[in-house]
């Protein structure tokens, strides 16, 4: 939790960190990823058979080794908008018998050479947990139940035996399942209304949890601020054993929201993720409201927020049907750092957050035929995933604020936009970690600093300008390491992310 006091530009900024004041446990799943059958994410990204850099499974070894550096706990699959016309059965069994299908989300052809079993093998090699999305477009409940049976079934039943026939004896025990993706959107095949969706999602959830009560089901929300979110939460978060339910466990475990931010101007770009912070706050209140209005007892586990698509993305600059390959700048990297600060600050409410996407498609990691490129946005992800874990701790920031235009325009009406965007954690290893983004394009900011102890390790992400980019043949943005004695004030460089780390007393 970070509190804030607005100062005039003439007053001296300060940051006070209180390591003894733990606020909430950080779910490591806020560092989750997302792979969709879109552009070069799967084919030519994580799966590239015939490339000398690929292993015997066709998986790019350099991609796997790089992603291991991020310690990704969960990866969402296989979509995304792709899911609305995807039928999982097409992607299992002998590859020479798998059909190619028209792909309507991104207007391509799906060969189905990479499917459930290939993805699960890749997850095992990466050391991550899967999160599957169900087809709420052209799919059926029978198809969804069959997929869960194929993945998790242990009995002598048809789809569990089909998995065994395809070479996997033990169940995959996939825990996380989404009840559709963005089904409210006009771009979706079989777009639906909130009334239709809420009824369908609840009925599907009942059946799925009868088949496997250990599943964690994620409701399809919008951006957290819409009437869709209120209605679906109101009609799907109900007491266990209510008249509408025969389940012994809550049917809905998480509520999904999506948001992408971007601006061609630096300051609107780096402050835009604060819209996500407000969306999380509103969604959390809507969850509370649904529980209160529906009489859900406090003994029943409260659903959390699954922010399972987020990133910096301009869909005009990087069009989805053309692969959505962004060339990220330092400004974008700092925006990603602010995004991650938001998730740390809101760790009480956020149970998962999936950056979209893991490889090539609006991604921090790009592939060529000969290797990989770590984009500017890689470095904040790397530092946060490595260090910003454990507990969110109390921090107070006093500084000036940016007073210009924001994207969206309503951000400054509901959120402060400080020059120093901050979050802080206490790790299980006893180290305090403080992430500070100086969003100013032209001004170093010296701030008083309270709470540091002993020698402080300093990690800085920066470049020559906010337009610095790693896609021009050289790495213009990376991480530099230094130390600080932890005394007095610290000067945070202009347009930078600084991570300070020390052993708690």
Curated annotation (Swiss-Prot):
Keywords from the named record: Carbohydrate metabolism, Glycoprotein, Glycosidase, Hydrolase, Polysaccharide degradation, Secreted, Signal
Gene Ontology process terms (BP): arabinan catabolic process; L-arabinose metabolic process
Enzyme class: hydrolase
Primary location group: secreted
Biological or metabolic pathway of the protein: Glycan metabolism; L-arabinan degradation
GO cellular component: extracellular region
An example molecular function term from Gene Ontology annotations: alpha-L-arabinofuranosidase activity
Cellular localization per UniProt: Secreted
Catalytic reactions on record: Hydrolysis of terminal non-reducing alpha-L-arabinofuranoside residues in alpha-L-arabinosides
SUPFAM superfamilies the record matches: (Trans)glycosidases, Glycosyl hydrolase domain
EC numbers, comma separated: 3.2.1.55
Pfam families for this protein: Alpha-L-AF_C
Record-annotated disulphide pairs: none
Glycosylation sites: 152, 269, 438
Family listed: Belongs to the glycosyl hydrolase 51 family.
Function text: Alpha-L-arabinofuranosidase involved in the degradation of arabinoxylan, a major component of plant hemicellulose. Acts only on small linear 1,5-alpha-linked L-arabinofuranosyl oligosaccharides.
Protein name stated in the entry: Probable alpha-L-arabinofuranosidase C
Species the sequence originates in: Aspergillus clavatus (strain ATCC 1007 / CBS 513.65 / DSM 816 / NCTC 3887 / NRRL 1 / QM 1276 / 107)
The organism's taxonomic lineage, starting at the top: Eukaryota, Fungi, Dikarya, Ascomycota, Pezizomycotina
Gene: abfC
């Amino acid at each position: 939790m970070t509190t804030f006091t607005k100062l005039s530009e003439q007053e001296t900024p300060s940051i006070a960190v209180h390591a003894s004041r733990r606020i909430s446990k950080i779910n490591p799943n806020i560092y989750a990823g997302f792979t969709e059958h879109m552009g070069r994410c799967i084919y030519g990204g994580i799966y590239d058979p015939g490339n000398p850099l690929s292993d015997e499974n066709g998986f790019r070894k350099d991609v796997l080794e790089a992603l291991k550096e991020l310690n990704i706990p969960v990866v969402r699959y296989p979509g995304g908008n792709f899911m609305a016309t995807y039928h999982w059965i097409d992607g299992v069994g002998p590859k020479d018998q798998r059909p190619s299908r028209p792909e309507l989300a991104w207007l391509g052809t799906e060969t189905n050479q990479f499917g459930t079993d290939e993805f699960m093998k890749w997850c095992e090699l990466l050391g991550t947990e899967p999160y599957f999305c169900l087809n709420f477009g052209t799919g059926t409940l029978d198809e969804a139940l069959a997929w869960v049976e194929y993945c998790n079934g242990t009995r002598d039943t048809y789809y569990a035996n089909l998995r065994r026939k395809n070479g996997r004896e033990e169940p995959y025990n996939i825990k996380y399942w989404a009840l559709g993706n963005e089904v409210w959107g006009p771009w979706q095949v079989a777009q639906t209304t909130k009334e239709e969706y809420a009824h369908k999602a609840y009925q599907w959830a009942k059946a799925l949890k009868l088949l496997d009560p250990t599943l964690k089901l994620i409701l399809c929300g919008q951006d957290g601020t819409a009437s869709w979110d209120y209605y679906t939460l109101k009609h799907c978060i109900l007491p266990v054993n209510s008249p509408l339910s025969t389940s012994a466990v809550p049917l809905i475990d998480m509520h999904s929201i999506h948001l992408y931010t971007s601006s061609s101007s630096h300051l609107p770009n780096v402050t835009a993720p604060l819209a996500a912070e407000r969306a999380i706050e509103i969604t959390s209140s809507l969850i509370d409201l649904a529980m209160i209005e529906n009489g859900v007892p406090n003994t029943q586990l409260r659903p959390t927020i699954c922010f399972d698509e987020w990133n910096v993305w301009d869909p005009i600059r990087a069009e989805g049907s053309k692969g959505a390959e962004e060339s990220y700048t330092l400004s974008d990297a700092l925006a990603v750092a602010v995004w991650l600060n938001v998730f740390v600050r809101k760790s009480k409410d956020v149970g998962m957050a999936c950056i979209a996407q893991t490889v090539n498609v609006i991604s921090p990691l790009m592939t060529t035929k000969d290797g990989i490129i770590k984009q500017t946005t890689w470095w904040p992800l790397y530092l946060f995933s490595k260090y910003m874990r454990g507990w969110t701790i109390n921090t107070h920031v006093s500084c000036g604020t940016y007073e210009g235009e924001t994207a969206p325009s309503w951000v400054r009406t509901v959120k402060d936009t400080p020059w120093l965007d901050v979050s802080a954690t206490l790790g299980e290893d006893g180290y305090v970690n403080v992430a500070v983004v100086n969003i100013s394009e032209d001004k170093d900011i010296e701030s008083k600093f309270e709470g540091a102890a002993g020698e402080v390790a300093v990690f800085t992400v920066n470049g020559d300008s906010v337009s610095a980019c790693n896609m021009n043949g050289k790495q213009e943005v990376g991480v530099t390491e230094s130390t600080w004695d932890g005394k007095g004030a610290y000067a945070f460089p202009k347009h930078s992310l600084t991570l300070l780390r020390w052993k708690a007393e």
